[in-house]
């Protein structure tokens, strides 16, 4: 299964903008500078729906790491399983054999060896098994699954997916077992109506960099808009309220060097979503 082919049409819907507020780290104001009386001016990003039709204008304003950190408790998901594995390897530890987050106590999600089993309220159980790589491919699995967590307000289980093309995310509906494929990490709005998916790989460009908004208060997640990005992109997203999200942004190096880009610091911006019905 190719996760990225399904998103190809979405990613070409519009060309990436280059908002000044997000492409360079903010410089500190002098200590004697007057406190601004109004919010800084916003940069804009135009977004499109699944057919490429205009779906609104996003506004971005500079934010801070402190503002992002204050919203940590609002994130219902633990650290991503793949990131825990990377952290263990980077610290010289052996990567855990089982990357699952703690499974729900109600027994509706079970790990049986390499297989994950989900039991929705209606319909048959959903079984996820790793897909082995082809004999002439690299060692390991082409597709692997780890339980990431639950979004009860949206009635979704979240699965971290590793593929031969890069990371992805799978949502499984806790009511019906219906699957929804995402490219990026999901962040659920405080009112449980919307889910923002962010995917970032600006350093190497090996996977798409984009963000997508889904409406999740109905029977199935519905794509509202999608936005492809260029030399900057959101690595993490945390909602402040029903229309504002603080983003941690990664940046590509001006030289295009991957190692240099990986060493650039994150910057922060607040995203204001267009009004939706």
Regions found by a protein language model. Name each.
Residues 109-111, 148-154, 186-197, 236-245:
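Blade-terminus and WD-like Trp-Asp/Gly-His loop motifs, strongest in beta-propeller folds
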Residues 30-157:
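Terminal domain-start segments
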Residues 1-12:
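Sec-dependent bacterial lipoprotein signal peptides
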Residues 235-277:
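Hydrophilic extracytoplasmic domains
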Residues 159-164, 197-209, 247-253:
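Beta-strand C-termini and the immediately following turn/loop, strongest in propeller blades
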Residues 14-17:
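Bacterial signal peptide processing site
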Residues 78, 115-137, 164-181, 209-225, ...:
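Surface-exposed loop/turn elements that mediate protein-protein interactions on large endomembrane-trafficking
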Residues 178-188, 228-234:
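Short coil/turn segments at the loop-to-beta-strand junctions that recur within blades
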């Amino acid at each position: 299964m190719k996760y990225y082919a399904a998103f190809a049409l979405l990613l070409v819907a519009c060309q990436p903008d280059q908002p000044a507020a997000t492409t360079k780290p903010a410089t500190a104001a002098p200590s004697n500078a007057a406190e601004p009386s109004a919010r800084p001016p916003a940069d804009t990003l135009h977004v499109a729906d699944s057919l490429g039709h205009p779906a609104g204008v996003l506004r971005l304003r500079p934010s801070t790491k402190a503002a992002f950190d204050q919203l940590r408790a609002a994130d219902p998901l633990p650290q991503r399983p793949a990131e825990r594995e990377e952290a263990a390897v980077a610290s010289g530890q052996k990567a855990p054999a089982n990357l699952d987050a703690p499974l729900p106590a109600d027994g509706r999600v079970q790990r049986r060896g390499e297989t994950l089993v989900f039991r929705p309220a209606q319909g048959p159980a959903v079984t996820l098994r790793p897909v082995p790589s082809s004999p002439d491919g690299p060692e390991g699995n082409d597709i692997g699954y780890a339980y990431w967590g639950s979004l009860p307000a949206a009635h979704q289980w979240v699965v971290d997916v590793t593929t031969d093309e890069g990371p992805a995310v799978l949502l499984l509906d806790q009511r019906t077992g219906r699957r929804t494929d995402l490219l990026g990490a999901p962040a659920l709005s405080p009112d449980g109506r919307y889910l923002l998916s962010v995917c970032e790989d600006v350093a190497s460009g090996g996977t798409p960099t984009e963000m997508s908004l889904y409406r999740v208060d109905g029977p199935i997640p519905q794509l509202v808009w999608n936005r492809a990005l260029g030399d900057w992109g959101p690595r993490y997203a945390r909602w402040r309220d029903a229309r504002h999200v603080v983003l941690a942004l990664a940046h590509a190096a001006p030289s295009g060097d991957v190692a240099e880009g990986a060493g650039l610091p994150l910057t922060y911006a607040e995203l204001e979503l267009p009004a939706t019905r």
